[in-house]
């Protein structure tokens, strides 16, 4: 009788230990899976650091703009650093060149062009950082990204807009000496080689 009781007690103890330890065993696995799924994405600190070194002394309000982008769109899996120039009174053109940076597929030079239509004032020579979301492959960046951008440099000289192609989002963050206020309805065409044709 005693050995039967002892056997049941041992079984209950083993069950208790198994139930107690199983969540502890599962937690690291779940955390590792989550870390693995985010391994191709950039943290906010990584983007802020890249932006500060790129924009230099003008980067005072950059962290606030990046924080707003992360709150709206989450973690990007790529970012572009480059320069563009455009100027318009009612209609104009935008040209730029830069580099796509990814964690899993390296760095890729690229160019962008596009019309800028709407109520634009002034000229613009701008450094630009673009956050890239849901990019399935580097080839998917070579496309037309359209959107409505209301640019007002309200955070220490930085403006943020949104462009989209299918599920891929591009969020340009710009700074520059020009002031372009109003509604800019246009698109950016991203190409692997330079071209003067924005269409």
Regions found by a protein language model. Give the residues of each.
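Sec/Tat signal peptide C-region and signal peptidase I cleavage site
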Residues: 26-34
């Amino acid at each position: 009788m005693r050995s039967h009781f002892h056997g049941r007690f041992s079984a209950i103890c083993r069950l208790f230990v198994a139930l107690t330890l199983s969540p502890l065993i599962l937690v690291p696995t779940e955390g590792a899976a989550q870390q693995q799924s985010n391994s191709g994405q950039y943290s906010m600190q990584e983007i802020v650091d890249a932006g500060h070194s790129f924009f230099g002394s003008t980067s005072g309000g950059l962290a606030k703009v990046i924080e707003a982008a992360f709150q709206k769109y989450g973690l990007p899996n790529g970012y572009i650093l480059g320069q563009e120039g455009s100027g318009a009174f009612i209609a104009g053109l935008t040209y730029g060149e830069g580099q796509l940076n990814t964690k899993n597929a390296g760095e890729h030079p690229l160019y962008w062009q596009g019309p800028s239509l709407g109520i634009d004032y002034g000229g613009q020579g701008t450094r630009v950082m673009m956050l890239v979301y849901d990019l399935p492959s580097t080839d998917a960046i070579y496309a037309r990204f359209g959107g409505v951008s209301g640019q007002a440099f309200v955070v220490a000289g930085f403006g943020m807009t949104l462009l989209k192609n299918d599920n891929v989002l591009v969020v340009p963050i710009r700074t520059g000496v020009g002031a372009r206020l109003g509604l800019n309805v246009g698109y950016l065409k991203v190409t692997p080689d330079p071209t003067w044709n924005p269409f």
